[in-house]
Design a protein with these regions (language model features):
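Sequence-level preference for short, compositionally simple segments enriched
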Residues: 2-351
């Protein structure tokens, strides 16, 4: 068994374990279908250093059924994986927009998202739409600050995902563990998921923080996106950001950073371990905002959102002295601890 096959299998099972920790797969069977298609036996066997022969169909050698083969039969039945792909896609560039296409099967410009990002012109004033076909893309993606005005256009957050498994330990710090890291301004993502499938840490484990997305560029927007992880899932680092109709999953401080961000209509799901009825255990928190000074103009606002899942969690922990988080018109299940907030063991951070 080769290293490549072992890696493929380990990522496959890590992804299944991460998603099985909630009822996500039962609610989104389409995503499970794409996951199984991506890791079909042919894909896994292709990791082996030899060619797997095509099996001979049973009964071919001694069949008494007489079938006259015509050359045209093969033309009618032969079909490639790219046959259903639009022949004229992506369209040509315009004065304001370029469209790149990513498909893991090689049906268009690029097979990886990072390759498409690398092809974007430095400091291009045009918007570059990177259209990402249905699939699971196992790669770490970085958009440097010299690549502004990029859009990631997926085909649905349950069918298109960028996945990696770094942790604070493996990447020299939490801030660098993100599966996708965006430092450029004017970034947009639509209908795509960002996942970190590192193992869910046990109590007291050090260095297991695992970011799915770090957004550190100004004026970013996310529509219909998914963010999957456990501790520190979404690093809403700095800048002004808008999240609309997104799905955000985690356990501890899973929306954290010092950005000025507005979350509208988002579904927030805790995957903290279940807590027995009546127990006073707290084992998670939704937010950890990092406003360090009253002069900083930052904070998280959640409007018309919903919070559910498992565990007994706080709405937030005051990561820095002036942490600012507001929940408005947001429904919450009884997983939220009655006290609501935690001052990080520093009473001066209480209002």
């Amino acid at each position: 068994m080769t290293t490549k096959l072992i890696s493929s299998l380990s990522i496959f099972f890590a992804l299944l374990a991460a998603l099985a920790s909630t009822n996500f797969l039962s609610q989104h069977t389409l995503f499970l279908k794409h996951l199984l298609i991506h890791f079909n036996p042919q894909t896994l066997l292709s990791s082996l250093p030899f060619i797997v022969p095509t099996p001979i169909p049973f009964g071919c050698r001694h069949s008494h059924h007489h079938h006259h083969h015509h050359p045209s039969d093969e033309r009618k039945t032969t079909k490639t994986i790219c046959d259903d792909f639009p022949p004229d896609f992506p369209p040509p560039d315009t004065n304001t927009t370029s469209i790149f296409c990513v498909d893991s099967n090689g049906c268009c410009n690029f097979t990886t998202v990072q390759a498409a990002v690398d092809a974007v012109g430095v400091m291009s004033p045009k918007r570059t739409v990177i259209w990402i076909n249905t699939g699971i893309y196992f790669e770490k993606v970085i958009i440097p600050k010299t690549k502004p005005n990029i859009t990631f256009q997926g085909q649905g957050y349950t069918s298109t995902a960028i996945v990696w498994n770094d942790t604070a330990n493996s990447s020299h710090g939490t801030f660098y563990s993100g599966s996708v890291q965006v430092f450029a301004p004017n970034f947009i993502a639509k209908n795509i998921s960002f996942m970190n499938v590192a193992p869910i840490p046990g109590p007291g484990v050090v260095g297991a923080q695992a970011v799915a997305l770090r957004i550190a560029g100004d004026q970013a927007a996310f529509w219909g996106c998914g963010f999957f992880g456990a501790q520190d899932t979404l690093h809403d680092d700095r800048g002004r950001h808008y999240f609309k109709d997104c799905y955000i999953q985690g356990s501890i401080d899973f929306i954290f950073g010092n950005a000025k961000s507005f979350y509208e209509g988002c579904h927030i799901t805790s995957i903290a371990s279940p807590v027995a009825p009546g127990a006073r255990v707290i084992n998670g928190a939704v937010t950890a905002h990092g406003r360090a000074s009253k002069d900083e103009n930052s904070g998280f606002a959640f409007v018309n959102c919903s919070i559910g899942g498992t565990g007994r969690i706080w709405l937030g922990r005051a990561w820095r002295p002036f942490s600012t988080v507001v929940f408005s018109y947001t429904s919450m299940t009884d997983i939220i601890a009655p006290e609501g907030w935690n001052d990080f063991n520093d009473p001066t951070r209480d209002l």
